[in-house]
Each structure stands twice: as C-alpha cells, then as structure tokens.
Amino acid sequence: MESTFIMIKPDGVQRGLIGEIISRFEKKGFYLKALKLVNVERSFAEKHYADLSSKPFFQGLVDYIISGPVVAMVWEGKSVVTTGRKIIGATNPLVSEPGTIRGDFAVDIGRNVIHGSDSIESANKEIALWFPEGLADWQSSQHPWIYEK
C-alpha cells in the first residue's frame, strides 16, 4: 500500500476543519497511520518547504505555517497520493472544484487549508521528516470491504 503525508494548515485548525478533513479521507477508504498536533518551529518549516526556498513567497509561507498549530498525518491506501491530491483540490482555491477540500473551504491561495504530498517521493521524504518515530502498524477491519485481494 502507498502512503502520503497530509497537513492541515493553521487556518484549517483554527477554523475547526480537522474532523471534516479526516472524515473525507476515511470515507474514501484510506487508513490513518499517524497523526499529531504540532506547533512548528521556523527551522523545521524551512526544512519542510526547502524546495520552495528560492520562491518570492517562501518567507510568507514559513511565517504562515508557524503562526499556529498544524495537524500532521500519514494516510495509507491504494493510489493515496494521487487520489489525496484530488480530494484536496487545486493549490489555488479559486480554481478548485466544488466538492474538494479547498473548493469547499478556502478562498485565498495563501490560506488554502491543507497540504498534501505531490508524489510518492515527496511523500516518503515528508513522512520521514515529520514522523521519524515511525507509523502505527495496523489495518482496519474494513479492509476487505474496501479493497479487492
């Protein structure tokens, strides 16, 4: 099974969207493998977004991520990276489809509620960064009702 890193950003936490977001991933049939509420340190945020460090919006993004707690999660399931991105919606909420998290809950690109890994490689990197202690080893009893053999 594939894994992805999902982070509910400070605006999503402050607006009380944690349960709604978790529910959407659970209803799709994905399994929560790790979760923590974190106040992110500046140096850690800079490491997480290191690939964007040359962009003009980098400092604003870092300031935003450290402005309040985030919920860091790992989800597991078939094609969870690609499907997770579809559940999340386009980076710019104004072009996100209704029914996606950003399409339903966000307006500004700088307050777009959620982050999701964009590839298996970035998922592996982000999971290792955010969860060096490892993930929960379990499988839902619903597994055979969601996935074929």
Swiss-Prot record:
* Free-text description of this protein's post-translational modifications in UniProt: Autophosphorylated.
Q: Which cofactor does it need?
A: Mg(2+)
Enzyme Commission number(s) of this protein: 2.7.4.6
Which residue spans traverse the membrane? none
Q: Which InterPro entries match?
A: NDK-like_dom, NDK-like_dom_sf, Nucleoside_diP_kinase, Nucleoside_diP_kinase_AS
**Reaction equations catalysed:** a 2'-deoxyribonucleoside 5'-diphosphate + ATP = a 2'-deoxyribonucleoside 5'-triphosphate + ADP; a ribonucleoside 5'-diphosphate + ATP = a ribonucleoside 5'-triphosphate + ADP
Report the record's Gene Ontology biological process terms: CTP biosynthetic process; GTP biosynthetic process; UTP biosynthetic process
Query: Does Metal-binding show up as a keyword for this record?
Result: yes
* Entry GO MF terms: ATP binding; metal ion binding; nucleoside diphosphate kinase activity
Q: SMART domains from the entry?
A: NDK
Against Pfam families, the record matches this protein to:
NDK
Which sites bind ATP?
Answer: K9, F57, R85, T91, R102, N112
Q: Any idea which residues are catalytic in this one?
A: H115
Which keywords accompany this UniProt record?
Answer: ATP-binding, Kinase, Magnesium, Metal-binding, Nucleotide metabolism, Nucleotide-binding, Phosphoprotein, Transferase
Q: Which family does it belong to?
A: Belongs to the NDK family.
State what this protein does.
Major role in the synthesis of nucleoside triphosphates other than ATP. The ATP gamma phosphate is transferred to the NDP beta phosphate via a ping-pong mechanism, using a phosphorylated active-site intermediate. Also exhibits a kinase-like activity towards histone H1.
What name does this protein carry?
Nucleoside diphosphate kinase 1
Q: Which organism is it from?
A: Saccharum officinarum
